[in-house]
Structures are given as C-alpha cells and as structure tokens.
Amino acid sequence: MSNISKQEKFFKALSDKNRLRILKMLRKKFLCVCEITEVLQLATSTVSQHLSILNEAGFIIERKDGKWVNYVINPNPSDPRVSKMLTSLDFWISDDRIIIEDLQKVQIVDRNKICSR
C-alpha cells in the first residue's frame, strides 16, 4: 500500500463525528457492537462499518471473549501517529457536550440486556 493510501485511511477514520465518538468511548472501556449501537442510537450495520474503518486505520482492534467480540483501543499500533492522535483527541473534544453524554451512557449501558433483544 502506498504511503498516500495509508494517509488517506488514517484521516478518513477521523473524518466522521460518530467515529470520534466511538474512539472516545473506547478510551473509557472496551465495548461490543450492541453497546456502541445503544449509545450512538445508530443502526448496527452503520456502527459495524465505522468500526471496520477504525480497525483498518489501526485505531482499534477486536478481542474475542466467549460469545462477545469486544472492541478496544489498539494498545500497540504500528503507526505512532495513532497514539499521538488519540492523546490529542482527549484534549480537543473531551469537553464536548455530546462526548460527555456518551461517556455517561457508557457507564450504565448493560450488554446483557441490550444484546439479547
């Protein structure tokens, strides 16, 4: 993959407000698709697409835990800009009202209730 293609994937991952919201939530704790869908109030397919883009760009990874597939911030990204950007996002958008509300919802969302619907 060319360097410009890598750059495009990196910046595309950051170009959507819902992907930024997902990154902030995953900085707080690991989540499954159902939990993210519940907080964002988006279709599961839309959330899955956002997760795929973030995964391809190296921001997140999947971790299987029994029947759950959890999404977490990539602890060892191959691109050093990923960690730097996540730290910058903490500074830039942490005081955003929507982000604050998302993080409050993340604390009370119950995967056992919502994933069995």
Tell where the protein language model's regions lie, with residue ranges:
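A general structural signal for well-ordered secondary-structure junctions
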Residues: 17-20, 32, 60, 99, ...
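Beta-hairpin "wing" of winged helix-turn-helix
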Residues: 56-65, 72-73
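Amphipathic alpha-helical dimerization/coiled-coil segments
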Residues: 78-117
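N-terminal helix-turn-helix DNA-binding core of bacterial DNA-binding proteins
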Residues: 5-46, 52, 68-78
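N-terminal intrinsically disordered/low-complexity leader segments
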Residues: 1-3
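Small-residue-rich alpha-helical segments with characteristic i,i+4
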Residues: 47-48, 63
